[in-house]
């Protein structure tokens, strides 16, 4: 049995040997993605897409609970429309893919394959918004977008990726700002409760904010070995896009006004976050809330009378409260154990003839590998309890890892020394000047992750220039 497991997992590079290769191995060996014949594009395989479907389902329920509606915008954007908002087009220009012909006929105007959909939403709003009575308009779209990245990695940075993008317009700036905050909190709640990933909430610096936004807010997660991953963003646009695209409405005082706008998005990058936060050298460890299979039943000595029948009976019962799979394939149990561990299934049940005689089975948690004997009649409480405990432990381990890898500095020498010796979050004060932010990158290799909402007073001055500090910033090395 041990040899079967070794054969199954030996192709996975150990995390401590080469974390980047380990990540790639997990993506392919766990059958999440397959590289396509188009460079930078991947195929989301059924298991990978099933994870994304659960992310979609759980997020979508949250969006609809706050009044948002799903829509679908065209995938192509006329160049003239994209150019109406200068900051946006300048921000995305290097990454835009263009359609220049339809069949064999050249197009009169180039069409951009959407890198994001602000322009199409604004164009739509300009046609359907008339009165303050139409507001707010709370829209969300599930789709893929294309950005011509130079360096790609599955889930983290691909030329096409799947995401949701919310776009809303409001009568007042206060309502739009409240929407921006609400959606950021939605992402944070989802990341921490469903994905078991602790996040830092904060505001991006002007250098790091979304092109064209007045303010960008973010949730930043720390991966296992200390690198940062931006895991969801929420943007407040003010009325800048409304003015650029002539989106107006008749206000309560019968004057023509511009609505205030937001956008917010999260993507399949979240799957990368799950892999790098929770995975181990044997594969994925999936949080139960988004696991395609929450419980796998593995028959032991399946050829013995009654074993498969009992497993089928258990699968039917468990299926009433959990996503369950009975692996009745002809592979050896040891191979199955290794396969489902690689795929990160939270709970495994082992059922053999002796177990059936004793009215029990073996329950194994994916994260601890600890085995416990559970009476069949107690599974309905034992399985949910095991999944709840696993989710809590995943979160607690990730939080402990973040705390262990978070440092504070008050001088540039301290920053450089910490950055040289450790990978993690470094907290410092900051004067607010772009030059000092760029010096952090040039001298210490760190980018600003955010100005956390939970501010601390570490010192009175900026460590770069010595001028009075305005905010505490979290710095790090990001994917």
Task: Map each language-model feature to its residues.
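NTP/phosphate- and nucleic-acid-binding module
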Residues: 1-479
């Amino acid at each position: 049995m041990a040899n079967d497991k070794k054969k199954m997992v030996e192709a996975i590079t150990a995390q401590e040997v080469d974390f980047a290769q380990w990540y790639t191995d997990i993506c392919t060996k766990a059958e999440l993605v397959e590289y396509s014949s188009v460079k930078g594009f991947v195929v989301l395989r059924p298991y990978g897409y099933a994870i994304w479907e659960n992310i979609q389902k759980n997020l979508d329920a949250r969006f609809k609970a706050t009044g948002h509606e799903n829509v679908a915008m065209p995938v192509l954007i006329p160049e003239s429309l994209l150019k109406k908002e200068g900051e946006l087009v300048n921000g995305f220009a290097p990454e835009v893919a263009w359609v220049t012909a339809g069949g064999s006929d050249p197009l009169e105007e180039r069409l951009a394959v959407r890198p994001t959909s602000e322009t199409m939403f604004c164009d739509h709003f300009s046609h359907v918004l008339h009165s303050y009575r139409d507001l707010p308009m709370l829209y969300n779209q599930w789709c893929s977008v294309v950005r011509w990245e130079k360096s790609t990695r599955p889930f983290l940075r691909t030329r096409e990726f799947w995401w949701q993008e919310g776009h809303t317009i409001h009568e007042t700036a206060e309502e739009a700002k409240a929407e921006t905050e609400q959606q950021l909190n939605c992402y944070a709640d989802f990341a921490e409760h469903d994905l078991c990933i602790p996040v830092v909430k904060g505001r991006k610096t002007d250098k790091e904010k979304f092109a064209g936004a007045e303010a960008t807010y973010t949730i930043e997660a720390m991966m296992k070995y200390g690198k940062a991953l931006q895991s969801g963003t929420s943007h407040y646009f003010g009325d800048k896009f409304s003015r650029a695209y002539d989106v107006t409405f008749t206000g309560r005082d019968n004057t023509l006004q511009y609505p205030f706008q937001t956008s917010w998005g999260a993507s399949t990058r979240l799957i990368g976050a799950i892999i790098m936060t929770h995975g181990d050298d044997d594969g994925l460890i999936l949080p139960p809330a988004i696991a395609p299979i929450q419980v796998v039943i593995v028959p032991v000595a399946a050829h013995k009378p009654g074993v498969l029948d009992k497993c089928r009976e258990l699968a039917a019962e468990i299926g009433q409260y959990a996503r369950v799979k009975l692996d009745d394939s002809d592979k050896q149990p040891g191979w199955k154990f290794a396969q489902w561990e690689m795929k990160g299934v939270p709970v495994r049940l082992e059922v053999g003839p002796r177990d059936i005689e004793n009215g029990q089975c073996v329950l194994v948690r994916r994260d601890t590998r600890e085995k416990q004997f559970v009476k069949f009649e107690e599974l309905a409480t034992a399985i949910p309890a095991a999944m709840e405990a696993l989710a809590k432990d995943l979160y607690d381990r990730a939080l402990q890892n973040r705390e262990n890898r978070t440092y504070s500095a008050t001088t540039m020498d301290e920053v450089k020394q910490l950055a040289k010796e450790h990978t993690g979050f470094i907290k410092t004060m900051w004067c607010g000047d772009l030059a000092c932010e760029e010096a952090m990158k040039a001298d210490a290799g760190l980018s600003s992750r955010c100005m956390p909402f939970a501010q601390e007073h570490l010192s009175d001055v900026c460590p770069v220039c010595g001028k009075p500090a305005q905010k505490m910033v979290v710095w790090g090395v990001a994917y």
